Curated annotation (Swiss-Prot):
Its EC number is 2.8.1.8. The gene is lipA. Keywords: 4Fe-4S, Cytoplasm, Iron, Iron-sulfur, Metal-binding, S-adenosyl-L-methionine, Transferase. It is found in: Cytoplasm. One of its GO terms (cellular component) is cytoplasm. This is Lipoyl synthase. [4Fe-4S] cluster 2 binds at C79, C83, C86.
Amino acid sequence: MSKIPAPDEKTSRSDSGSSILRKPDWLRVRSPGGAAFNETHGLIRKLGLATVCEEAACPNIGECWTKKQATVMILGEVCTRACAFCNVKTGHPDKVNPLEPGHVADVAAEMNLEHIVITSVDRDDLEDGGASQFVKVIEAVRARTPKTTIEILTPDFRGKPDHALDMIVKARPDVFNHNLETVPRLYPTIRPGARYFTSLRLLEKVRERDPSIFTKSGLMLGLGEDRLEVHQVMDDMRQADVDFLTLGQYLQPTPRHVRVEEFVTPDSFKAYAATARAKGFSMVASSPLTRSSYYAGADFARLKEARQKKLEKIAAKNSGKGA
């Protein structure tokens, strides 16, 4: 079992005490609030659930919660990793809550969700990395709200047996998302507990086991990567047959986290999106405020449509060859 980092290890991997750079105008958002926002907040509190919206200090929380959209975080609020960019607490997690799957299903039902995103902290302390809890949550949501489509955003299950991933694939989430987060060169400082090719291989394994499951991955920009490195990651993702790419600006949560090296301009995000589409991604979301689950439901609908068009194009091409 890997060592669980101490809660202050994020500080030692960043410029401790460095001031947070002032955000440019294109990153400014309205403060959260309003009746719909408070209703979503109240429901999540009532069911005792955590959301990545809060734990990761997402800038889009006001907009998403007002629209009755939230990304549920299972397996507790304490992570066994200490990624330098992440605002989630690090330490020794609590025991897995057996009531959690039912509570997530309650959220899907009470919010009348067409699409739900389920993520988790890393649980290196568990034999299967928490895979069985993902399966129970998927099954509970399907039983309660069969029409709700399900997207999961998973950890890397590094060092866990293959059956951990196998059981999730057999549960057939509609979208399997695992973020590469940054370019390989920056992994030792940004994702010290992870390995780039382990994460890439995870996405590839999902497609090998069930090609019908959509795969998705994302990068944070502004950590010191360069354009060619981002393009290489795109190529690696396409080699792994990833369908959907998300690109967003890294924002430093607190002074103890790794600092922002660059605020990437909206025009640069548009240029990256054009490159990604040219490389063959079925769906690309690329903007300063893009996050993995931002507009996830609408993007999933467009992703299905894009795949259908691609299949029809292939069928027409094959039909022409046989004529």
